[in-house]
From Swiss-Prot:
Residues 131-921 are vacuolar. The gene is dapB. Its EC number is 3.4.14.5. InterPro entries: AB_hydrolase_fold, Peptidase_S9_cat, Peptidase_S9B_N, Serine_Prot_S9B/DPPIV. It holds the Pfam family Peptidase_S9. One of its GO terms (cellular component) is fungal-type vacuole membrane. It catalyses: Release of an N-terminal dipeptide, Xaa-Yaa-|-Zaa-, from a polypeptide, preferentially when Yaa is Pro, provided Zaa is neither Pro nor hydroxyproline. The keyword Transmembrane helix applies. This is Probable dipeptidyl-aminopeptidase B.
Length: 921
């Protein structure tokens, strides 16, 4: 379920910390925006002339003068200031009038008395009126979204704006590449107007003090090329390390979430001509292709078999022969792509270019799940005669919880010997109990680190393999179940640190995320077989997908962390010996930062993602002699748009449930009045290790609800979510949904008790894991707090979801049958106690299968429960996009919620026909 908070990415806040890990083809996917980055840099250099750049953080207008507050007391204070401003204008007017000497003092006193009596009577009448209104049932006062008060020129956030991406901040990605001779600060630039199609720029040329820089280098002059009379257009590009060739993918066809098929071509930079990757199979659909670090060969997978093409010869060498429907080589199957690698590659070159590590996946025992397509034919194949009216069925090997997993082996290929071999190491897991989650080559040493866990992800083994000697050993073994009862998250952030005795590093080593006193921190293991790390970070905070980069020249490690707050992100550095911890970003103000470093860590693209308008700049790191800063994106258009619209007031605070402090954000309507009674919608995701409450900027569906409809929207990250310590995270193990639902309910009770909340109009909604949590909360609450719920693509029984994700948090069903019974949505009588709920699902969902919703409907039918609505979307997967479906999802949520808070569903329980007026017949 990796990445699910972003299923509806255009509607959610940017860079919530479920950021997906980059796959091996990240260069191709990001190169196209680098041109904009470099154009911005060039514009600023031209504008500044010889002016020396500084590292000053640019200041940008906030989303609104009072759009943010840290707690309720701060917000009340701000509202009082607003009222004082209004009173001061009146005061000034009255003062001017009081200077008129001609007004008799007695007359003036009489006027004041009469005015006071009038105002007192008006206030009393208003109080009586409001008092009567307060006792009206919500259904008697329908909410009119168009009647939300508006002052001045402020506009409401609209659904069209949100759905159309108009509130998305412009954000550029940089494709940093390493030069052929190790140069740092090189960018791959693709598709820039007025420039050649694919070029390499040197960011160092933008610094007046830079020396030894490279001239702009053209890799591809045009955005098209010809091979054997065919005109081809690049979809993805992968330059060789020596920058003499470009591997080009065309005719890309999507497979699963990350993987795709394509035709590949080798483009020669000098001659500007191309040839097919495989000269004897021009139309072969290749699943994955990657360069040798020495730029002299390409390894690729086709039809689940691996091949090697050396540039010195047109001949393609077949590495494996038994790949097919049940055996995968070098690419992951569905569950490994989704839950382990979050990418399309299971192939790893060593830096010397002499060896390739790759995964062999055996799916022969994995059951198949049929995904049906009733409208489209994703295979692209015409049906057989007579089968035109039957749906297309795609059988996917999908291991559900407790079912047989694919078995995996790590194999190696010796290029000089053209030999595949395996290194067996004693003390490992049984094949049916083994997950291989990460492979990291130790540079050019011929050694590799392999991270393995058992099936339930609570026992970790790190293995060091020497492929030259063809031997290996276990260097770390940790039973996390004994440590805190939790699990190991999948990670691919381990960083190899080569030995450099002259620079204070006598041995090779690696940096890994470790558990230290309830939090995730960085440890430096050196030598590589040392099981006790040098602790680089510590404290009641966590590192996030760290390290971000390592400056080997200066022994500096860069990382993002939650040191200032669980809901912010700042960039820090620390020395390899664990000393000299420094903040790189300005921690005196709140910020939610991301960073993308150049290959040598001398430069970084710094992304400020909130709480105010996002911006980006390229800066040199502190140890770089060529110091400069260039802003590449300010999002002025977004800032102007924010000024013209009335955005929700965001109140960040915490609640304590069962001794755990939980992060909450409340989105109030722009003209919030504490004397009114507001409906409240809770929005959640809540998956293990996820985070929804953050200080990142985002105007999404929740913002629309608060701004346009005038409802309050609350999000609480309950137990099980990330960045608040492992104790709060791991308490859910074996019983997911229980504590998370309790946290939603207890927080909702706090809101229900607030004077400005209409406790009879409270709803909750979520997608994917959030859909499961919506139903689980309604089930546990049984109508006591929440009256309504909306669940999109929900899991309803964790026995239906994939094994690797589910068993990490629940163990296997064989190990924990009672836990699976508890977590399933089965108490439908409790669901019947809610006023009404809505369920929506994509019929072709290959992730959370439609089986989940259909099984729930059957339970509801058996129990005679009818207080719900259902909408299914033909041929839509988990993101629900097919044939305008995504817009329908949000229109449905919008209209259904308005009807709920208008009390429409209160009138459906015992519907009676209207009397027929004979006069109108």
């Amino acid at each position: 379920m990796a990445g699910h908070p972003e299923e509806n990415a255009q509607l959610l806040s940017t860079e919530q910390e479920s950021m997906s890990r980059n796959s091996s083809d990240s260069v191709a996917s990001t190169a196209s925006t680098t041109s904009l980055v470099f154009d911005r840099i060039g514009e600023r250099v031209a504008a500044n002339g010889s002016e020396k750049p500084t590292m000053v953080t640019p200041k940008f207008p906030p989303r609104g003068e009072r759009a943010y507050a840290d707690d309720e007391h701060t917000q009340i204070h701000l509202e009082e200031e607003e009222e004082k401003d209004y009173d001061m204008e009146d005061g000034a007017f009255l003062t001017n009038g009081a200077t008129n000497k001609s007004v008799d003092k007695k007359l003036r006193r009489l006027i004041w008395i009469i005015g006071g009596v009038f105002i007192g009577a008006w206030v009393l009448a208003l109080f009586i009126f409001l008092g009567k209104q307060a006792y009206k049932h919500s259904s008697e006062s329908p909410h009119d979204p168009q009647a939300t008060s508006s002052r001045g020129s402020g506009k409401k956030v609209t659904m069209d704006q949100v759905m159309g991406g108009q509130w998305r901040a412009t954000k550029h990605s940089i494709s940093w590449i390493e030069g052929a001779n190790g140069e740092d600060g090189l960018l791959l630039e693709q598709g820039s107007v007025g420039k050649d199609y694919l070029i390499v720029e040197d960011v160092r040329t933008q610094s007046p003090s830079a020396v030894g820089t490279l001239d702009t280098m053209t890799l591809m002059k045009n955005g098209y090329f010809e091979v054997a009379g065919r005109s081809l257009t690049p979809s993805k590009v992968y330059p060789s390390k020596d920058l003499k060739k470009v591997l080009v993918a065309t005719d890309v066809q999507s497979n699963w979430r990350h993987s795709f098929y394509a035709k590949y071509w080798i483009f020669d930079v000098e001659t500007q001509t191309a040839e097919p990757l495989d000269p004897v199979d021009l139309d072969g659909r290749v699943q994955l292709a990657s360069w040798s670090p020495k730029s002299d060969a390409i390894v690729f997978t086709r039809d689940n078999n691996m091949y090697l093409r050396k540039l010195a010869s047109p001949t393609v060498v077949q590495i494996t022969v038994d790949g097919g429907p049940e055996f995968f080589y070098g690419v992951p199957d569905w569950v490994y792509e989704e839950e382990v690698f979050a990418g399309a590659s299971a192939t790893w070159w060593d830096d010397s270019g002499k060896y390739i590590a790759f995964l062999r996946t055996n799916e022969s025992e994995v059951p198949e799940y049929p995904v049906q397509y009733f409208v489209s034919r994703p295979s692209g194949k015409d049906p057989l005669p007579g089968e035109e009216n039957y749906p297309e069925v795609r059988e996917i090997k999908y291991p559900k919880a407790g079912a047989p997993n694919p078995t995996v082996d790590l194999l190696f290929y010796d290029i000089s010997k053209a030999e595949v071999f395996e290194v067996k190491i004693a003390g490992g897991f049984e094949p049916k109990d083994l997950l291989i989650t990460e492979v990291v080559w130790a540079g050019s040493t011929g050694k590799a680190l392999i991270r393995e866990t058992n099936r339930e992800s609570d026992v970790l083994r790190v293995v060091l393999v020497d492929v030259v000697a063809r031997e290996g050993k276990t260097v770390r073994f940790t039973d996390i179940a004994k440590l805190d009862g939790g699990w190991f998250e999948v990670s691919e952030d381990t960083r190899y640190i080569p030995a450099d005795p002259a620079n204070g590093r006598p041995h090779d080593g690696y940096i890994d995320t470790i558990i230290h006193e309830n939090y995730d921190h960085l440890g430096y293991f050196t030598p590589m077989d040392n099981s006790e790390p040098i602790l680089l970070t510590s404290g009641d905070w966590e590192v996030v997908k760290a390290p971000s980069a390592v400056d080997l020249k200066n022994n500096i490690v860069y990382f993002i962390s939650t040191k200032e707050s669980p809901i912010t992100r700042q960039l820090y550095s620390v020395k390899l010996d664990g000393t000299d911890l420094k903040a790189i970003t300005d921690t005196s103000t709140e910020g939610y930062y991301g960073a993308s470093f150049s290959k040598g860590a001398g430069y970084v693209l710094l992304n400020y993602n909130g709480p105010n308008i996002p911006w980006q700049k390229v800066i040199s790191t502190p140890s770089n002699d060529n110091q400069y800063t260039h802003i590449i994106e300010e999002n002025k258009g977004l800032a102007d748009m924010a000024k013209k619209h009335e955005l929700p007031i965001l109140i960040y605070q915490t609640v304590t449930v069962d001794g755990f402090e939980l992060q909450v954000v409340e989105r109030r309507p722009p003209h919030f009045n504490p004397k009114k009674k507001y409906p409240v919608l809770f929005y959640l995701y809540g998956g293990p290790g996820s985070q929804t409450v953050s200080k990142s900027f985002g105007v999404d569906f929740q913002s629309y609800i608060a701004s346009n409809l005038g409802y309050i929207v609350v999000t609480v990250d309950g137990r099980g979510t990330g960045f608040i310590g492992r104790k709060a995270r791991t308490i859910i193990r074996g019983n997911i949904g229980h504590y998370e639902a309790r946290d939603q309910i207890e927080t909702a009770k706090i809101w229900a008790s607030k004077k400005y909340v209409d406790e009879s109009r409270m709803a909750i909604w979520g997608w994917s894991y959030g859909g499961f949590m919506t139903l689980k909360t309604l089930e546990q609450d049984a109508g006591e707090t929440f009256s309504y719920g909306m669940a999109v693509a929900p899991v309803t029984d964790w026995r239906f979801y994939d094994s690797i994700y589910t068993e990490r948090y629940m163990h296997t069903p064989q190990h924990n049958p009672g836990g699976y019974d508890n977590t399933s949505i089965s108490d439908v009588k409790s669901l019947a106690k809610n006023v009404r709920f809505l369920v929506m699902h994509g019929v072709a969902d290959d992730n959370v299968h439609m089986q989940n919703t259909l099984t729930l409907l059957d339970k509801l039918d058996l129990a005679g429960v009818e207080n719900y609505d259902v909408h299914v979307f033909p041929d839509s997967d988990h993101s629900i996009y097919f044939h305008n479906a995504n817009r329908i999802v949000y229109d449905k949520l919008n209209n259904w919620l308005i009807n709920a808070f208008n009390g429409e569903w209160l009138r459906t329980a015992n519907a009676v026909p209207l009397e027929i007026d004979a006069a109108k017949v």
